[in-house]
Amino acid sequence: MEFSRETRRLALQKMQERDLDLLIIGGGITGAGVALQAAASGLDTGLIEMQDFAQGTSSRSTKLVHGGLRYLKQFDVEVVSDTVSERAVVQQIAPHIPKPDPMLLPVYDEPGSTFSMFRLKVAMDLYDLLAGVSNTPAANKVLTKEEVLKREPDLKQEGLLGGGVYLDFRNNDARLVIENIKRANRDGALIASHVKAEDFLLDDNGKIIGVKARDLLSDQEIIIKAKLVINTTGPWSDEIRQFSHKGQPIHQMRPTKGVHLVVDRQKLPVSQPVYVDTGLNDGRMVFVLPREEKTYFGTTDTDYTGDLEHPQVTQEDVDYLLGVVNNRFPNANVTIDDIESSWAGLRPLLSGNSASDYNGGNSGKVSDDSFDHLVDTVKAYINHEDSREAVEKAIKQVETSTSEKELDPSAVSRGSSFERDENGLFTLAGGKITDYRKMAEGALTGIIQILKEEFGKSFKLINSKTYPVSGGEINPANVDSEIEAYAQLGTLSGLSMDDARYLANLYGSNAPKVFALTRQLTAAEGLSLAETLSLHYAMDYEMALKPTDYFLRRTNHLLFMRDSLDALIDPVINEMAKHFEWSDQERVAQEDDLRRVIADNDLSALKGHQEG
């Protein structure tokens, strides 16, 4: 279904003519998940996003659907259980996006190590049990030092004890957002990017009945009426709530910044994802991950109080991460000049969630008796000497000793909250990408109840565990072969097998729609046929309005295909200018915006400062 600039115009027109059941402010993964479930459940739904979809936070993650193995060190079993369960659901509803990618975790004999070899084995076995992959080909493996080095020969050898391999999943975070958004659009949601909420509309009793917003592309004020409004703006949540609390600061959020750096894989060669202690005795671990022909690594975790729209990578961030990777891969000698791209993102942490870190990890301590009992029970289960029920009982005992006290009953997942202010505004905040569906489900359960109680409207919430996102209509048990079949179809449209396979992986069950564009398109000047199809599909079916939308969020060109990016800039801008009928002034403005983003990402300012 079309999802274009024209779709946006019509959506804004219709939003101003209706009294929506639900208006969503924020088009990251949280808002996208709410929009999908709301529209599919029959609510008259609207969504506005002040930037591009996923631009703020949801495209700036570590790009994993991460199971959180390290939180089993404190036996925070609940968060890991929730995470691996939700990860399995996401794999079911978006099977073309999360892909299994076994993770290597080296263990070193040094102060502050997250795991000993013994604890790693217990944690991995428990993790497999929770993930339902025990006694399958995806089950964990314990590795000797020699086996670790055979897999990753460039790892630091000194102090290396061995390691483990366990199941994890890579993710395309921005694609997950846009596929949720597209499905919501197909189900009738009215959706527009580059529309900023500026204030609430209030009735005589001070209750919210809509939003005053501004179309940032035309600078026109827009009035949108809605029975209920939900704030899903992540780090901006406090700013939205501030509309009704002028002069009264709101500090629900405590954003922290996470930075990732990208280098060529020849500079930092890894054959599989690696998750390793920093070696700085700071209680942190970093990921070193292959993607395309690049390697990226991160992340930092520092409190942030600056510009929420444009968090920057600082020299301190670079020094920290280079120090870690050069310690763990001593022959790499990565310098700032090797960095081809980067990104800085904000984690929307809740300031009151003091017992948990950004992944919901519990900081409570486990008693020796509880730990020993759980270890013995897991061992017995693995040896078929005890039951799963016995393991679950032992887990409950550990949870009791480590759980957060007096958890807010309104929380719909660990590390997240769902609240309603006195003026009627709902705010769904916190959480992590893996939790997005569950968070939306919890929020919609409450919203549907309020719509019935306060407005007399009845809706039945869909079962979102089985409701695929756009592009996700693929058998989750047969993903590779179905993607390959789509790729074969692409070759019949004149694409090379490599290009067809790339597009099939990117678009999933929407790939035939992309290939069908060959009936009306030929390769644009300076672009391959595949690039032309991808660009036009992004403009007409994914509301890509700017070159940065295309290069950074509809595709990963700007992050992981830096070698070929420069040759694509002018042809892509030319094609977009023709498609959107940009003036010369608008074309220059769009190119300037793209060049600024590229300069930020490749750290031109920091590199120039060092040279100076």
Curated annotation (Swiss-Prot):
Residues 399-418 are annotated as: Disordered. One of its GO terms (cellular component) is cytoplasm. Disulfide bonds: none annotated. FAD binds at residues 21-49. Its cofactor is FAD. Keywords: Cytoplasm, FAD, Flavoprotein, Glycerol metabolism, Oxidoreductase. Residues 399-408 have a biased composition (Basic and acidic residues). It catalyses: sn-glycerol 3-phosphate + O2 = dihydroxyacetone phosphate + H2O2. It holds the Pfam family DAO_C. GO terms for biological process: glycerol metabolic process; glycerol-3-phosphate catabolic process. Its EC number is 1.1.3.21. It is found in: Cytoplasm. InterPro entries: DAO_C, DAO_C_sf, FAD-dep_OxRdtase, FAD/NAD-bd_sf, G3P_DH_FAD-dep. GO terms for molecular function: glycerol-3-phosphate dehydrogenase (quinone) activity; glycerol-3-phosphate oxidase activity. Its main location: cytoplasm. Belongs to the FAD-dependent glycerol-3-phosphate dehydrogenase family. This is Alpha-glycerophosphate oxidase. It comes from Streptococcus pyogenes serotype M1.
